[in-house]
Amino acid sequence: MKYFGTDGFRGEANVGLTVEHAYKIGRFVGWYYGANRERKARVIVGKDTRRSSYMFEAALVSGLVASGADAYMLHVIPTPGVAHQTVEGCFDCGIMISASHNPFCDNGIKLVNSDGFKMDEDVLELIEDYIDGKSEVPLATGNHIGATVDYMQGRNRYIASLIASANFSLQGVKIGIDCANGSASSVAKPVFDALGADVRVINAAPDGFNINVDCGSTHMERLQRHVVEQGLDVGFAYDGDADRCLAVDERGRVVDGDQILYVCGVYLNKHGRLSGGTVVPTVASNFGLIKSLELAGLSAVTSGVGDRHVYAKMREGGYSLGGEQTGHTIFGDIERTGDGIMTSLRVMEVIRAERETLSQLTAPCKLLPQAQVAVHVADKDAALENMGVQNAIAEAEASLAGEGRVLVRKSGTESVIRVLAEAPDQASADAAMKRIAAALEAL
């Protein structure tokens, strides 16, 4: 598609994604869901803490009400909170304004349908046609113009649902959380407070510009120091819209999404709560995770990269747990998309039930050394088809002699090619990755 990628419509604010785009998305969505149901559409809208999110919210809501929809504003909330409230409140559509882990200058618009799933591609194609002027929708007039509703109660209900999902106490547990100066800043602490934890929060003072800046799940160093210096039991880091979660164990070591899948998968399987004894990682997950799951008596079925593809594979096979190394973890029995705060609660459930530290729980998961890089390119398709790049990939694979692997793929949200190499030792992984990266950088 032209505008919508694997994680919505994303771009630099007022460059790749403009207020005109936001207004037109609102116009089409407001009309589409009303016309198809012969009544006013009800659309719920959330945003992250970027300066531009407020601008895009105003444009989007203007478009919605101009087409006759009632717009319910959740204000700042994690992306999974929008999906949760779309379903709980029986809304026709949910819209989140966020560029997730990207820098503050970027932004994005994600849409979910009434079931809380990411919007069907056929609807997104209709929106793109309207943006490009290939179709028209009428303006509402008179009493058909929509209303704007301050819906802070929806955010409060989302927080209450997170608390209610935890049937355990965290009394006496010292937990560090890094809110990335994003959507988790006003949501995560109340959840852990309600469960009795001793919570030490960092990076929860958003100013519109500091979202994801040297903090959160893409910059774990400060949380690692925080856990060690404060003598905490565990730490959790979210990204800008809090749909991802990575952890830090009591020794200050990062626990990535693959390790979280392992810990939760083994625990759920032990208690008969893992459907089919199967976990759904992605093709980019560490091969060591697959082998470790097999040694623990579990199966793995891989999906494409992106939580949309993970959940599609989970639905297809009736599986209940899946996720990505980056920290998107989906617990299919209670949610339809990655939820960073929910993930941290599920990890705490395992720690409390098993009476083990996070380092003890992750110890059996033996990951292979990896090397990763994202290389900016002008044309992603042309880059992958380039003969020099193809030769570099073949040479890198040959250098690993069947004891590792390389994965080279297009990003679904940025103009980059992502290169991943795995090998028995770090030096071999680094060498394979650098060989391919050099070929891409030479284009």
Language-model features, listed with the residues they occupy:
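An N-terminal, well-structured beta->alpha segment
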Residues: 1-62, 66-67, 148-175
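General beta-strand structural signal in soluble alpha/beta enzymes
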Residues: 4-5, 45, 71-75, 96-97, ...
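Gly/Ser/Thr-enriched, mixed-charge loops and adjacent short helices
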Residues: 12, 107-230
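N-terminal small/polar loop signature for handling phosphorylated ligands or for N-terminal nucleophile
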Residues: 31, 42-106, 190-248
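Short glycine-centered, acidic/aromatic-flanked micro-motifs in structured strand/loop junctions
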Residues: 45-48, 177-179, 249, 333, ...
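Proline/glycine-rich low-complexity loops and linkers
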Residues: 125-159, 164, 250-323, 330-331
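Phosphate-binding and adjacent anionic-ligand microenvironments
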Residues: 234, 271-443
